[in-house]
Amino acid sequence: MFMNGSSLNSSALDPSEQALQRPPWVTTTLGCFLIFTIVVDILGNLLVIFSVYRNKKLQNAGNIFVVSLAVADLVVAIYPYPLVLTSIFHRGWNLGYMHCQISGFLMGVSVIGSIFNITGIAINCYCYICHSLKYDKLYSDKNSVCYVLLIWALTVLAIVPNLFVGSLQYDPRVYSCTFEQSASSAYTIAVVFFHFILPIMIVTYCYLRIWVLVIQVRRRVKNDNRPKITPHDVRNFVTMFVVFVLFAVCWAPLNFIGLAVAISPERVVPLIPEWLFVASYFMAYFNSCLNAIVYGVLNQNFRREYKRIVVSVCTARIFFGESSNEAQERLKSKPSPLMTNNNQVKVDSV
């Protein structure tokens, strides 16, 4: 899901040779942008993980994928992004060949892990709404953990070959070690299709089916014995749909540039301005800090737990027991299979 870079190996690590002549304000802007992304990424995704850990309402099958997605976003903020930041301010890569390989590998793990987890979330939503009578069996705790492990196994499997074919290279235009794919058009097309276009198609299908069912249920006039989809359910699915849309918007420019270059490199490469290539990369980087913000804005239970965690940190009580009122409130609500849904939907597929 990354585009072509320039050559880097163990004997070609001179930062002065890699540096691009850019005005100081450009590197400063990119550096500040990345610092903001790193800080929000780490704090936001830690809030997501701790929220699910602390709040019984959030401990359900659907949120296993949410936590897995948060881990995928954390991976890049902890290691690759700080190395990119170092490269920006040193105007070149001076961290050695091995760090370049590890950084590129972890970036790939993060982005492919993200799209696979988003696909898993969409399938979970689809089963919960459109096949809810089978949902409990499909998404038992054991099965859900197995699905997440499968996602990460497929993610690593998709990335490992790059370590052996020498495709992890440093690109001075974006100060990053990434995947050099210009050498093989077929490989680039395959990567974009299987790691972006195909998952996007699957997720789109799942959400279209969900919204068709939601519209049908809300238009019913006569009372029947079939349970309704609650407003909480709709809000929760909107939350996950927004997460998907933001990912697609942030990553689409980079992937389509890569696809165009792979199809006709001689014609397309001269037509792509450097600023567009750089902007598409940093826009993709920015996506890793957005999900936690979306949960806080659109999901009431996440928002409340965020506040409790912040207050707990400020009062040094984060790992102490919760208040009796909070405990009683949580005992009244039975956790549901997705996000914060408190009412199980039992509507069969339409």
From Swiss-Prot:
Q: Where, in residue ranges, is this chain on the Extracellular side?
A: 1-29, 85-101, 166-187, 262-267
Q: Which GO terms describe its cellular component?
A: plasma membrane
Write out the entry's keywords from A to Z. Biological rhythms, Cell membrane, Disulfide bond, G-protein coupled receptor, Glycoprotein, Membrane, Receptor, Transducer, Transmembrane, Transmembrane helix
Residue intervals passing through the bilayer: 30-50, 64-84, 102-122, 145-165, 188-208, 241-261, 268-288
Which SUPFAM superfamilies does this one have?
Answer: Family A G protein-coupled receptor-like (SSF81321)
Does the UniProt entry include the keyword Cell cycle?
A: no
Describe how expression is induced or repressed: By cocaine, which increases the levels of day-time expression.
Q: Where in the cell is it found?
A: Cell membrane
Listed GO MF terms: G protein-coupled receptor activity; melatonin receptor activity
Protein's GO biological process? G protein-coupled receptor signaling pathway; rhythmic process
Q: List the disulfide bonds.
A: C100-C177
Q: Sugar-bearing residues? A: N4, N9
- Kindly give the PROSITE patterns that the UniProt entry links to this protein: G_PROTEIN_RECEP_F1_2
Stated family: Belongs to the G-protein coupled receptor 1 family.
- InterPro entries membership: GPCR_Rhodpsn, GPCR_Rhodpsn_7TM, Mel_1A/1B_rcpt, Melatonin_rcpt
Summarizing the function annotation, the protein's role is: High affinity receptor for melatonin. The activity of this receptor is mediated by pertussis toxin sensitive G proteins that inhibits adenylate cyclase activity.
Q: Which gene encodes it?
A: mtnr1aa
Topology, Cytoplasmic side: 51-63, 123-144, 209-240, 289-350
Q: What is its main location?
A: membrane
Does the record carry Iron-sulfur as a key word?
A: no
Q: Which SMART domains match?
A: 7TM_GPCR_Srsx
Q: What is this protein called?
A: Melatonin receptor type 1A-A
The scientific name of the source species is Danio rerio
Membrane disposition: Multi-pass membrane protein
